[in-house]
């Protein structure tokens, strides 16, 4: 089992977040790419499976090397467009991603997600990508349109998807 941090998150978080350059697109095209290259180099003869949570599953389509995995397990990942959220949650999502993300990110140079009970702080670019996923009807498609190539359409492995039922 291998785990890793994206730049700007966990142990890869810089001491100063203001102005730190990272985005979900960089996580998928560079950070995840580095991991997949490491796996291909060091574990050539092993069976390979991938467990991706949230953005960890979404970014698989940003890297052609995702083909190395026999099967996937996706946990809590989805087309995150606000229109797919329960009506009771939409106003909070609109306030958070429509106002809080751009205002706090512009003022602080990063998004203090922990202030809002949303986990650890995010680099500004990652917060704006998250905002894009929530506020745009095309959601993931809108994000993938900003990378060199969308590899998600070539992924045909069996996948177990674990999600919470809407109530």
Where are these regions (language model features)?
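Short beta-strand/loop motif that positions the catalytic acidic residue
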Residues: 155, 161-163
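Acidic catalytic loop of the alpha/beta-hydrolase fold
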Residues: 165-167
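Conserved catalytic-core motifs of eukaryotic protein kinase domains, centered on the activation segment
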Residues: 13-18, 85
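Active-site nucleophile elbow and catalytic-triad environment of alpha/beta-hydrolase enzymes
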Residues: 133-151
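Alpha/beta-hydrolase active-site loop
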Residues: 21-40
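Short coil/turn segments at beta-strand junctions that form active-site/ligand-binding loops
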Residues: 45-47, 70, 157-158
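Alpha/beta-hydrolase-fold enzymes
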Residues: 51, 55-138
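Conserved alpha/beta-hydrolase
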Residues: 1-15
């Amino acid at each position: 089992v291998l785990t890793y941090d994206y730049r700007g998150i966990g142990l890869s978080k810089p001491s100063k977040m203001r102005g730190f350059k990272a985005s979900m697109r960089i996580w998928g095209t560079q950070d995840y790419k580095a991991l997949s290259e490491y796996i291909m180099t060091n574990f050539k003869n092993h069976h390979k499976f991938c467990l991706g949570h949230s953005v960890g599953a979404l970014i698989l389509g940003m890297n052609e090397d995702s083909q190395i995995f026999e099967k996937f397990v996706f946990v809590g990942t989805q087309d995150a467009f606000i229109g797919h959220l329960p009506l009771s949650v939409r106003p909070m999502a609109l306030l958070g991603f429509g106002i809080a993300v751009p205002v706090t990110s512009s003022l602080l140079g990063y998004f203090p997600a922990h202030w809002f009970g949303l986990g650890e702080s995010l680099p500004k670019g990652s917060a704006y990508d998250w905002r894009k996923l929530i506020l745009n009807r095309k959601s993931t498609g809108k994000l993938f349109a900003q990378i060199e190539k969308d590899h998600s359409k070539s992924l045909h492995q069996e996948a177990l998807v674990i999600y919470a039922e809407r109530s």
